[in-house]
Protein backbone atom coordinates (compact mmCIF):
# COMPACT_ATOMS: atom_id res chain seq x y z
CA UNK A 1 0.00 0.00 0.00
CA UNK A 2 1.36 3.45 -0.90
CA UNK A 3 0.07 6.96 -1.47
CA UNK A 4 -0.58 6.19 -5.14
CA UNK A 5 -3.08 3.56 -4.16
CA UNK A 6 -4.46 5.91 -1.56
CA UNK A 7 -5.63 8.10 -4.42
CA UNK A 8 -7.67 5.15 -5.64
CA UNK A 9 -9.23 4.84 -2.19
CA UNK A 10 -10.09 8.56 -2.19
CA UNK A 11 -11.52 8.27 -5.69
CA UNK A 12 -13.64 5.28 -4.70
CA UNK A 13 -14.99 7.07 -1.63
CA UNK A 14 -15.59 10.24 -3.61
CA UNK A 15 -17.43 8.53 -6.46
CA UNK A 16 -19.45 6.52 -3.94
CA UNK A 17 -20.50 9.78 -2.30
CA UNK A 18 -21.56 11.29 -5.63
CA UNK A 19 -23.55 8.15 -6.55
CA UNK A 20 -25.20 8.16 -3.12
CA UNK A 21 -26.11 11.85 -3.48
CA UNK A 22 -27.64 11.28 -6.92
CA UNK A 23 -29.63 8.38 -5.50
CA UNK A 24 -30.83 10.58 -2.63
CA UNK A 25 -32.26 13.04 -5.15
CA UNK A 26 -34.27 10.36 -6.93
CA UNK A 27 -35.58 8.18 -4.16
CA UNK A 28 -38.76 9.11 -2.29
CA UNK A 29 -38.79 7.17 0.99
CA UNK A 30 -41.74 7.30 3.33
CA UNK A 31 -40.66 8.86 6.63
CA UNK A 32 -40.42 6.59 9.64
CA UNK A 33 -42.99 7.48 12.25
CA UNK A 34 -43.02 6.97 16.00
CA UNK A 35 -45.75 6.01 18.42
CA UNK A 36 -47.35 9.45 18.26
CA UNK A 37 -47.34 9.49 14.46
CA UNK A 38 -50.01 8.25 12.08
CA UNK A 39 -49.64 8.24 8.31
CA UNK A 40 -52.88 8.90 6.49
CA UNK A 41 -53.94 9.30 2.90
CA UNK A 42 -56.01 12.31 1.91
CA UNK A 43 -57.31 13.56 -1.37
CA UNK A 44 -56.38 16.70 -3.22
CA UNK A 45 -57.91 19.76 -1.68
CA UNK A 46 -57.51 18.28 1.78
CA UNK A 47 -56.92 21.67 3.34
CA UNK A 48 -60.66 21.88 3.78
CA UNK A 49 -60.68 18.45 5.41
CA UNK A 50 -58.11 19.72 7.89
CA UNK A 51 -60.36 22.66 8.72
CA UNK A 52 -57.97 25.09 7.03
CA UNK A 53 -59.64 27.38 4.49
CA UNK A 54 -58.52 28.32 1.03
CA UNK A 55 -57.17 31.79 0.33
CA UNK A 56 -59.33 34.61 -0.99
CA UNK A 57 -59.04 38.12 -2.37
CA UNK A 58 -58.53 41.06 -0.08
CA UNK A 59 -56.56 44.26 0.22
CA UNK A 60 -52.78 44.07 0.32
CA UNK A 61 -50.88 45.88 3.05
CA UNK A 62 -47.11 46.24 3.25
CA UNK A 63 -44.87 45.97 6.30
CA UNK A 64 -41.24 47.07 6.22
CA UNK A 65 -38.64 46.58 8.92
CA UNK A 66 -34.87 46.73 8.74
CA UNK A 67 -34.74 43.03 7.75
CA UNK A 68 -38.18 42.19 6.32
CA UNK A 69 -40.41 43.52 3.57
CA UNK A 70 -43.75 41.70 3.74
CA UNK A 71 -47.07 41.84 1.93
CA UNK A 72 -50.10 40.69 3.94
CA UNK A 73 -53.54 39.94 2.53
CA UNK A 74 -56.35 41.37 4.67
CA UNK A 75 -58.50 38.41 3.57
CA UNK A 76 -57.40 35.96 6.25
CA UNK A 77 -54.25 37.86 7.18
CA UNK A 78 -51.86 35.60 5.24
CA UNK A 79 -48.30 36.62 4.42
CA UNK A 80 -48.18 36.32 0.63
CA UNK A 81 -44.83 37.92 -0.11
CA UNK A 82 -41.58 38.19 1.83
CA UNK A 83 -38.46 40.01 0.66
CA UNK A 84 -35.19 39.96 2.60
CA UNK A 85 -33.38 43.30 2.05
CA UNK A 86 -30.19 42.14 3.76
CA UNK A 87 -29.74 39.28 1.28
CA UNK A 88 -29.44 40.09 -2.44
CA UNK A 89 -31.01 37.72 -4.92
CA UNK A 90 -27.68 37.31 -6.68
CA UNK A 91 -24.14 38.43 -5.99
CA UNK A 92 -23.81 42.11 -6.87
CA UNK A 93 -27.56 42.57 -7.37
CA UNK A 94 -29.61 45.34 -5.75
CA UNK A 95 -32.72 43.16 -5.89
CA UNK A 96 -33.52 41.55 -2.51
CA UNK A 97 -33.99 37.82 -2.18
CA UNK A 98 -37.65 36.81 -2.33
CA UNK A 99 -38.65 33.99 -0.01
CA UNK A 100 -42.47 34.07 -0.06
CA UNK A 101 -44.21 34.68 -3.37
CA UNK A 102 -47.74 34.74 -4.79
CA UNK A 103 -47.77 34.83 -8.58
CA UNK A 104 -49.43 32.80 -11.35
CA UNK A 105 -46.12 30.94 -11.77
CA UNK A 106 -45.41 30.13 -8.13
CA UNK A 107 -47.16 30.01 -4.76
CA UNK A 108 -45.35 30.14 -1.42
CA UNK A 109 -47.40 31.56 1.46
CA UNK A 110 -47.50 31.60 5.25
CA UNK A 111 -51.15 31.24 6.28
CA UNK A 112 -52.55 31.57 9.79
CA UNK A 113 -55.75 32.24 11.65
CA UNK A 114 -58.43 30.85 13.95
CA UNK A 115 -60.35 27.69 13.12
CA UNK A 116 -62.38 25.48 15.43
CA UNK A 117 -66.15 25.45 15.83
CA UNK A 118 -66.51 29.24 16.09
CA UNK A 119 -63.32 30.35 14.39
CA UNK A 120 -63.71 32.90 11.58
CA UNK A 121 -61.34 30.82 9.42
CA UNK A 122 -63.51 27.71 9.68
CA UNK A 123 -64.90 27.06 6.15
CA UNK A 124 -68.23 26.07 7.72
CA UNK A 125 -68.61 29.64 8.98
CA UNK A 126 -68.30 31.19 5.52
CA UNK A 127 -65.50 32.94 3.66
CA UNK A 128 -62.30 33.78 5.45
CA UNK A 129 -62.49 36.96 7.55
CA UNK A 130 -61.84 40.27 5.84
CA UNK A 131 -59.81 42.17 8.41
CA UNK A 132 -59.87 45.93 8.87
CA UNK A 133 -56.59 47.81 9.19
CA UNK A 134 -55.95 51.43 10.04
CA UNK A 135 -53.54 51.95 7.11
CA UNK A 136 -52.07 50.14 4.13
CA UNK A 137 -48.36 50.64 4.84
CA UNK A 138 -46.48 50.02 8.08
CA UNK A 139 -42.81 50.96 8.52
CA UNK A 140 -40.43 50.38 11.42
CA UNK A 141 -39.10 53.90 11.92
CA UNK A 142 -35.55 54.82 12.86
CA UNK A 143 -35.09 54.45 16.59
CA UNK A 144 -38.17 52.23 16.85
CA UNK A 145 -37.51 48.71 18.15
CA UNK A 146 -40.98 47.21 17.76
CA UNK A 147 -43.75 47.50 15.19
CA UNK A 148 -47.29 46.21 15.70
CA UNK A 149 -49.73 45.62 12.85
CA UNK A 150 -53.24 45.05 14.29
CA UNK A 151 -56.05 43.66 12.14
CA UNK A 152 -59.63 43.37 13.41
CA UNK A 153 -62.74 41.48 12.31
CA UNK A 154 -66.23 41.46 13.80
CA UNK A 155 -68.53 38.57 12.94
CA UNK A 156 -72.31 38.68 12.49
CA UNK A 157 -72.86 37.93 16.18
CA UNK A 158 -70.77 40.91 17.23
CA UNK A 159 -67.74 38.94 18.42
CA UNK A 160 -64.44 40.71 17.74
CA UNK A 161 -61.32 38.91 16.54
CA UNK A 162 -58.02 40.77 16.51
CA UNK A 163 -54.90 39.45 14.80
CA UNK A 164 -51.73 41.41 15.54
CA UNK A 165 -48.36 40.91 13.85
CA UNK A 166 -45.48 41.99 16.10
CA UNK A 167 -42.13 42.78 14.47
CA UNK A 168 -38.86 43.54 16.25
CA UNK A 169 -35.79 45.27 14.90
CA UNK A 170 -33.25 42.88 13.42
CA UNK A 171 -35.52 39.88 14.01
CA UNK A 172 -36.86 37.34 11.51
CA UNK A 173 -39.23 35.88 14.11
CA UNK A 174 -42.69 37.47 13.90
CA UNK A 175 -45.15 36.95 16.73
CA UNK A 176 -48.80 36.61 15.70
CA UNK A 177 -51.09 37.41 18.63
CA UNK A 178 -54.82 36.69 18.65
CA UNK A 179 -57.46 38.31 20.82
CA UNK A 180 -61.02 36.91 20.89
CA UNK A 181 -63.68 39.08 22.55
CA UNK A 182 -66.85 37.10 23.24
CA UNK A 183 -69.85 39.45 23.31
CA UNK A 184 -72.42 36.65 23.10
CA UNK A 185 -74.10 34.36 25.60
CA UNK A 186 -72.40 31.09 24.67
CA UNK A 187 -68.74 30.04 24.90
CA UNK A 188 -66.68 30.41 21.73
CA UNK A 189 -64.48 27.48 20.72
CA UNK A 190 -61.49 28.49 18.60
CA UNK A 191 -58.05 27.12 17.82
CA UNK A 192 -55.05 28.70 16.15
CA UNK A 193 -53.55 27.26 12.99
CA UNK A 194 -50.46 27.97 10.94
CA UNK A 195 -49.89 26.60 7.47
CA UNK A 196 -47.13 26.89 4.90
CA UNK A 197 -48.05 26.09 1.32
CA UNK A 198 -45.84 25.98 -1.74
CA UNK A 199 -45.81 24.89 -5.37
CA UNK A 200 -43.90 21.65 -5.82
CA UNK A 201 -42.33 22.63 -9.14
CA UNK A 202 -39.99 25.61 -9.25
CA UNK A 203 -40.31 28.19 -12.04
CA UNK A 204 -37.11 29.13 -13.90
CA UNK A 205 -36.54 32.31 -11.88
CA UNK A 206 -36.35 30.30 -8.64
CA UNK A 207 -34.68 27.15 -9.95
CA UNK A 208 -31.07 28.22 -9.43
CA UNK A 209 -28.29 25.67 -9.70
CA UNK A 210 -30.47 22.61 -10.27
CA UNK A 211 -28.35 21.52 -13.23
CA UNK A 212 -25.23 21.54 -11.09
CA UNK A 213 -24.73 18.11 -9.55
CA UNK A 214 -22.49 19.54 -6.84
CA UNK A 215 -25.12 21.93 -5.52
CA UNK A 216 -27.90 19.58 -4.45
CA UNK A 217 -29.50 20.62 -1.16
CA UNK A 218 -32.76 19.62 0.47
CA UNK A 219 -35.94 21.47 -0.46
CA UNK A 220 -39.09 20.33 1.25
CA UNK A 221 -40.97 20.25 4.54
CA UNK A 222 -39.85 19.38 8.05
CA UNK A 223 -41.26 19.15 11.53
CA UNK A 224 -40.09 18.76 15.11
CA UNK A 225 -41.66 17.27 18.23
CA UNK A 226 -40.22 16.30 21.62
CA UNK A 227 -39.99 12.72 20.31
CA UNK A 228 -38.67 13.61 16.85
CA UNK A 229 -36.19 16.48 17.08
CA UNK A 230 -35.97 16.93 13.32
CA UNK A 231 -37.72 15.03 10.55
CA UNK A 232 -37.72 15.90 6.86
CA UNK A 233 -40.80 15.35 4.72
CA UNK A 234 -40.32 15.45 0.96
CA UNK A 235 -42.68 17.43 -1.24
CA UNK A 236 -43.01 14.39 -3.50
CA UNK A 237 -44.20 12.33 -0.55
CA UNK A 238 -46.92 14.90 0.20
CA UNK A 239 -47.87 15.15 -3.47
CA UNK A 240 -48.35 11.36 -3.48
CA UNK A 241 -51.03 11.85 -0.80
CA UNK A 242 -49.08 10.05 1.91
CA UNK A 243 -49.57 12.66 4.56
CA UNK A 244 -48.40 13.36 8.05
CA UNK A 245 -50.71 13.38 11.08
CA UNK A 246 -48.85 13.86 14.37
CA UNK A 247 -50.20 14.98 17.74
CA UNK A 248 -47.66 16.54 20.06
CA UNK A 249 -47.04 19.22 22.63
CA UNK A 250 -44.53 21.81 21.51
CA UNK A 251 -42.57 21.52 18.29
CA UNK A 252 -42.81 23.30 14.94
CA UNK A 253 -43.44 22.83 11.22
CA UNK A 254 -41.31 24.30 8.45
CA UNK A 255 -40.51 24.53 4.76
CA UNK A 256 -36.84 24.53 3.84
CA UNK A 257 -34.58 25.39 0.95
CA UNK A 258 -30.89 26.19 0.66
CA UNK A 259 -29.98 28.91 3.19
CA UNK A 260 -33.59 29.99 3.96
CA UNK A 261 -36.62 28.68 5.83
CA UNK A 262 -40.13 29.47 7.01
CA UNK A 263 -41.58 27.92 10.14
CA UNK A 264 -44.67 28.09 12.32
CA UNK A 265 -44.08 27.64 16.05
CA UNK A 266 -47.26 27.24 18.14
CA UNK A 267 -47.06 28.93 21.54
CA UNK A 268 -49.40 27.04 23.85
CA UNK A 269 -49.41 24.39 26.55
CA UNK A 270 -51.91 22.15 24.79
CA UNK A 271 -51.60 19.50 22.12
CA UNK A 272 -50.99 20.48 18.51
CA UNK A 273 -51.78 18.47 15.42
CA UNK A 274 -49.06 18.56 12.76
CA UNK A 275 -50.17 17.62 9.27
CA UNK A 276 -49.27 17.74 5.60
CA UNK A 277 -51.74 17.99 2.73
CA UNK A 278 -51.85 17.84 -1.04
CA UNK A 279 -53.89 20.92 -1.97
CA UNK A 280 -54.07 20.07 -5.66
CA UNK A 281 -52.81 22.04 -8.65
CA UNK A 282 -49.24 21.10 -7.75
CA UNK A 283 -49.37 22.77 -4.32
CA UNK A 284 -48.55 21.05 -1.02
CA UNK A 285 -48.79 22.23 2.57
CA UNK A 286 -47.50 21.53 6.05
CA UNK A 287 -49.13 23.05 9.09
CA UNK A 288 -50.38 22.78 12.64
CA UNK A 289 -53.73 23.08 14.41
CA UNK A 290 -53.71 23.88 18.10
CA UNK A 291 -55.95 22.37 20.75
CA UNK A 292 -59.29 24.26 20.94
CA UNK A 293 -59.67 27.04 23.49
CA UNK A 294 -62.97 28.06 25.08
CA UNK A 295 -63.65 31.78 25.52
CA UNK A 296 -66.48 32.32 27.98
CA UNK A 297 -69.24 34.94 27.44
CA UNK A 298 -68.09 38.43 28.31
CA UNK A 299 -64.46 37.31 28.38
CA UNK A 300 -61.49 37.92 26.10
CA UNK A 301 -59.21 35.06 25.12
CA UNK A 302 -55.58 35.42 24.04
CA UNK A 303 -53.49 33.06 21.89
CA UNK A 304 -50.20 33.40 20.06
CA UNK A 305 -47.86 31.75 17.58
CA UNK A 306 -44.55 32.65 15.96
CA UNK A 307 -43.58 32.77 12.30
CA UNK A 308 -39.95 32.48 11.27
CA UNK A 309 -39.39 33.86 7.79
CA UNK A 310 -35.81 34.41 6.76
CA UNK A 311 -32.27 33.05 6.62
CA UNK A 312 -31.19 29.96 8.53
CA UNK A 313 -29.11 31.68 11.20
CA UNK A 314 -28.42 28.91 13.67
CA UNK A 315 -28.01 30.80 16.95
CA UNK A 316 -31.06 32.99 16.33
CA UNK A 317 -33.21 30.03 15.30
CA UNK A 318 -32.16 28.05 18.36
CA UNK A 319 -33.31 30.96 20.54
CA UNK A 320 -36.75 30.95 18.89
CA UNK A 321 -37.57 27.25 19.32
CA UNK A 322 -35.77 24.06 20.36
CA UNK A 323 -34.12 22.27 17.42
CA UNK A 324 -35.18 24.92 14.90
CA UNK A 325 -31.49 25.40 14.13
CA UNK A 326 -31.41 21.83 12.78
CA UNK A 327 -33.14 23.13 9.67
CA UNK A 328 -29.66 24.13 8.51
CA UNK A 329 -29.24 21.09 6.31
CA UNK A 330 -25.86 19.53 7.11
CA UNK A 331 -26.98 16.10 5.94
CA UNK A 332 -26.13 12.90 7.76
CA UNK A 333 -22.78 14.32 8.92
CA UNK A 334 -24.39 17.15 10.90
CA UNK A 335 -22.60 15.99 14.08
CA UNK A 336 -19.30 16.88 12.38
CA UNK A 337 -20.49 19.88 10.36
CA UNK A 338 -21.99 21.70 13.35
CA UNK A 339 -18.83 21.80 15.50
CA UNK A 340 -16.79 22.58 12.38
CA UNK A 341 -18.99 25.58 11.69
CA UNK A 342 -18.81 26.76 15.29
CA UNK A 343 -15.02 26.60 15.09
CA UNK A 344 -15.03 28.34 11.72
CA UNK A 345 -17.32 31.08 13.05
CA UNK A 346 -15.08 31.57 16.09
CA UNK A 347 -12.02 31.92 13.86
CA UNK A 348 -13.92 34.36 11.63
CA UNK A 349 -14.64 36.55 14.65
CA UNK A 350 -10.89 37.23 14.80
CA UNK A 351 -9.78 37.30 11.15
CA UNK A 352 -12.94 38.75 9.58
CA UNK A 353 -12.61 36.78 6.33
CA UNK A 354 -14.29 33.43 5.70
CA UNK A 355 -11.65 32.35 3.19
CA UNK A 356 -8.78 32.88 5.62
CA UNK A 357 -10.91 31.18 8.27
CA UNK A 358 -11.15 28.11 6.02
CA UNK A 359 -7.37 28.16 5.57
CA UNK A 360 -6.81 28.31 9.33
CA UNK A 361 -9.33 25.56 10.08
CA UNK A 362 -7.58 23.41 7.47
CA UNK A 363 -4.29 23.76 9.35
CA UNK A 364 -6.08 22.92 12.60
CA UNK A 365 -7.76 19.82 11.17
CA UNK A 366 -4.59 18.59 9.50
CA UNK A 367 -2.63 19.27 12.69
CA UNK A 368 -5.05 17.14 14.68
CA UNK A 369 -4.83 14.44 12.01
CA UNK A 370 -1.01 14.50 11.89
CA UNK A 371 -0.48 11.45 14.15
CA UNK A 372 -2.76 9.43 11.86
CA UNK A 373 -1.00 10.80 8.78
CA UNK A 374 2.37 9.83 10.23
CA UNK A 375 1.08 6.36 11.04
CA UNK A 376 -0.25 6.09 7.48
CA UNK A 377 3.11 6.92 5.87
CA UNK A 378 4.99 4.69 8.30
CA UNK A 379 2.69 1.80 7.46
CA UNK A 380 3.17 2.41 3.74
CA UNK A 381 6.96 2.56 4.16
CA UNK A 382 6.99 -0.75 6.01
CA UNK A 383 4.86 -2.28 3.28
CA UNK A 384 7.35 -1.12 0.66
CA UNK A 385 10.21 -2.65 2.63
CA UNK A 386 8.37 -5.97 2.61
CA UNK A 387 7.81 -5.99 -1.15
CA UNK A 388 10.98 -8.00 -1.99
CA UNK A 389 10.03 -10.67 0.57
CA UNK A 390 6.44 -10.75 -0.68
CA UNK A 391 7.58 -11.04 -4.29
CA UNK A 392 9.99 -13.86 -3.43
CA UNK A 393 7.24 -15.67 -1.53
CA UNK A 394 4.86 -15.40 -4.50
CA UNK A 395 7.49 -16.82 -6.84
CA UNK A 396 8.22 -19.63 -4.41
CA UNK A 397 4.58 -20.62 -3.86
CA UNK A 398 3.41 -20.16 -7.44
CA UNK A 399 -0.37 -20.48 -7.84
CA UNK A 400 -1.06 -21.71 -4.32
CA UNK A 401 -3.21 -18.74 -3.27
CA UNK A 402 -4.14 -20.22 0.10
CA UNK A 403 -0.50 -20.72 1.13
CA UNK A 404 0.33 -17.25 -0.17
CA UNK A 405 -2.39 -15.71 1.97
CA UNK A 406 -1.37 -17.65 5.08
CA UNK A 407 2.33 -16.85 4.79
CA UNK A 408 1.65 -13.22 3.92
CA UNK A 409 -0.44 -12.76 7.06
CA UNK A 410 2.27 -14.47 9.08
CA UNK A 411 4.83 -12.09 7.57
CA UNK A 412 2.70 -9.07 8.44
CA UNK A 413 2.36 -10.32 12.00
CA UNK A 414 6.06 -11.00 12.37
CA UNK A 415 7.01 -7.57 11.01
CA UNK A 416 4.20 -5.86 12.99
CA UNK A 417 2.70 -4.35 9.86
CA UNK A 418 -0.99 -3.64 9.34
CA UNK A 419 -1.74 -3.91 5.59
CA UNK A 420 -4.75 -1.62 6.05
CA UNK A 421 -2.87 0.91 8.16
CA UNK A 422 -2.54 3.30 5.23
CA UNK A 423 -6.29 3.30 4.59
CA UNK A 424 -7.63 4.11 8.05
CA UNK A 425 -6.50 7.77 8.08
CA UNK A 426 -8.09 8.29 4.67
CA UNK A 427 -11.35 6.76 5.81
CA UNK A 428 -11.34 9.05 8.84
CA UNK A 429 -10.50 12.16 6.80
CA UNK A 430 -13.21 11.59 4.18
CA UNK A 431 -16.13 12.34 6.54
CA UNK A 432 -14.42 15.61 7.51
CA UNK A 433 -14.15 16.52 3.84
CA UNK A 434 -17.82 15.70 3.23
CA UNK A 435 -18.89 17.49 6.43
CA UNK A 436 -17.12 20.61 5.20
CA UNK A 437 -18.97 20.24 1.89
CA UNK A 438 -22.31 20.20 3.70
CA UNK A 439 -21.24 23.10 5.91
CA UNK A 440 -20.34 25.28 2.93
CA UNK A 441 -23.58 24.44 1.13
CA UNK A 442 -25.82 24.94 4.15
CA UNK A 443 -24.44 27.89 6.12
CA UNK A 444 -26.04 31.22 5.21
CA UNK A 445 -22.98 33.06 6.55
CA UNK A 446 -20.94 31.70 3.63
CA UNK A 447 -23.48 32.70 0.98
CA UNK A 448 -21.86 35.41 -1.17
CA UNK A 449 -18.91 35.49 1.27
CA UNK A 450 -15.82 36.91 -0.50
CA UNK A 451 -12.26 35.65 -0.09
CA UNK A 452 -9.71 37.55 -2.17
CA UNK A 453 -8.90 38.56 -5.74
CA UNK A 454 -11.40 36.93 -8.12
CA UNK A 455 -13.19 34.81 -5.48
CA UNK A 456 -16.25 36.83 -4.48
CA UNK A 457 -18.44 33.93 -3.31
CA UNK A 458 -16.97 30.99 -1.41
CA UNK A 459 -20.25 29.06 -1.72
CA UNK A 460 -20.14 29.18 -5.54
CA UNK A 461 -17.79 27.59 -8.05
CA UNK A 462 -14.68 29.42 -9.19
CA UNK A 463 -15.84 31.41 -12.25
CA UNK A 464 -12.42 31.07 -13.90
CA UNK A 465 -11.66 27.51 -12.67
CA UNK A 466 -8.29 28.64 -11.31
CA UNK A 467 -8.68 27.01 -7.89
CA UNK A 468 -9.63 23.57 -9.30
CA UNK A 469 -6.60 23.70 -11.60
CA UNK A 470 -4.34 24.63 -8.67
CA UNK A 471 -5.87 21.76 -6.72
CA UNK A 472 -5.01 19.39 -9.58
CA UNK A 473 -1.44 20.71 -9.64
CA UNK A 474 -1.01 20.05 -5.91
CA UNK A 475 -2.34 16.52 -6.39
CA UNK A 476 0.15 16.02 -9.22
CA UNK A 477 3.06 17.10 -7.00
CA UNK A 478 1.94 14.80 -4.19
CA UNK A 479 1.76 11.96 -6.69
CA UNK A 480 5.22 12.65 -8.12
CA UNK A 481 6.83 12.98 -4.69
CA UNK A 482 5.35 9.74 -3.39
CA UNK A 483 7.20 6.42 -3.71
CA UNK A 484 5.25 3.74 -5.53
CA UNK A 485 5.30 0.00 -5.90
CA UNK A 486 2.59 -0.09 -8.54
CA UNK A 487 3.81 -2.12 -11.52
CA UNK A 488 0.53 -2.86 -13.27
CA UNK A 489 0.35 -0.67 -16.44
CA UNK A 490 -3.39 -0.11 -16.08
CA UNK A 491 -3.03 1.08 -12.49
CA UNK A 492 -0.18 3.36 -13.53
CA UNK A 493 -2.38 4.98 -16.18
CA UNK A 494 -5.19 5.46 -13.68
CA UNK A 495 -2.77 7.10 -11.25
CA UNK A 496 -1.44 9.38 -13.95
CA UNK A 497 -4.89 10.68 -14.85
CA UNK A 498 -6.22 10.86 -11.28
CA UNK A 499 -5.31 14.56 -10.76
CA UNK A 500 -7.02 15.38 -14.06
CA UNK A 501 -10.14 13.44 -13.10
CA UNK A 502 -10.35 15.16 -9.72
CA UNK A 503 -9.78 18.56 -11.32
CA UNK A 504 -12.75 17.99 -13.61
CA UNK A 505 -14.92 16.92 -10.66
CA UNK A 506 -13.95 20.00 -8.66
CA UNK A 507 -14.73 22.48 -11.43
CA UNK A 508 -18.31 22.72 -10.12
CA UNK A 509 -17.60 22.52 -6.42
CA UNK A 510 -17.81 25.54 -4.07
CA UNK A 511 -14.67 27.67 -4.06
CA UNK A 512 -14.41 27.32 -0.29
CA UNK A 513 -14.27 23.54 -0.55
CA UNK A 514 -11.64 23.64 -3.29
CA UNK A 515 -9.65 26.13 -1.20
CA UNK A 516 -9.74 23.70 1.70
CA UNK A 517 -8.48 20.89 -0.50
CA UNK A 518 -5.65 23.01 -1.95
CA UNK A 519 -4.42 24.02 1.50
CA UNK A 520 -4.83 20.45 2.72
CA UNK A 521 -2.68 19.21 -0.17
CA UNK A 522 -0.01 21.82 0.56
CA UNK A 523 0.03 20.72 4.19
CA UNK A 524 0.31 17.13 2.97
CA UNK A 525 3.40 18.02 0.94
CA UNK A 526 5.04 19.64 3.97
CA UNK A 527 4.09 16.83 6.34
CA UNK A 528 5.20 14.29 3.76
CA UNK A 529 8.73 15.70 3.67
CA UNK A 530 8.97 15.88 7.46
CA UNK A 531 7.80 12.29 7.83
CA UNK A 532 10.13 11.02 5.10
CA UNK A 533 13.12 12.56 6.88
CA UNK A 534 12.20 10.68 10.03
CA UNK A 535 11.71 7.46 8.07
CA UNK A 536 15.13 7.87 6.43
CA UNK A 537 16.78 7.89 9.84
CA UNK A 538 14.99 4.62 10.62
CA UNK A 539 15.99 3.11 7.29
CA UNK A 540 12.41 2.92 6.06
CA UNK A 541 12.71 5.40 3.21
CA UNK A 542 15.27 6.40 0.58
CA UNK A 543 15.53 9.55 -1.55
CA UNK A 544 15.81 7.64 -4.78
CA UNK A 545 14.15 9.31 -7.72
CA UNK A 546 10.60 8.09 -8.19
CA UNK A 547 10.07 5.94 -11.23
CA UNK A 548 7.19 7.00 -13.43
From Swiss-Prot:
Transmembrane intervals: 6-26, 350-370, 424-444, 458-478, 499-519
Intracellular or extracellular location(s): Cell inner membrane
Keywords: Cell inner membrane, Cell membrane, Chaperone, Membrane, Protein transport, Transmembrane, Transmembrane helix, Transport
UniProt key word Protein biosynthesis: no
A Pfam match: 60KD_IMP
CC annotations in GO: plasma membrane
Coiled-coil region(s): none
Annotated Low complexity bias: 29-42
Function: Required for the insertion and/or proper folding and/or complex formation of integral membrane proteins into the membrane. Involved in integration of membrane proteins that insert both dependently and independently of the Sec translocase complex, as well as at least some lipoproteins. Aids folding of multispanning membrane proteins.
Similarity comment: Belongs to the OXA1/ALB3/YidC family. Type 1 subfamily.
Name this polypeptide is given: Membrane protein insertase YidC
Natural source organism: Salmonella schwarzengrund (strain CVM19633)
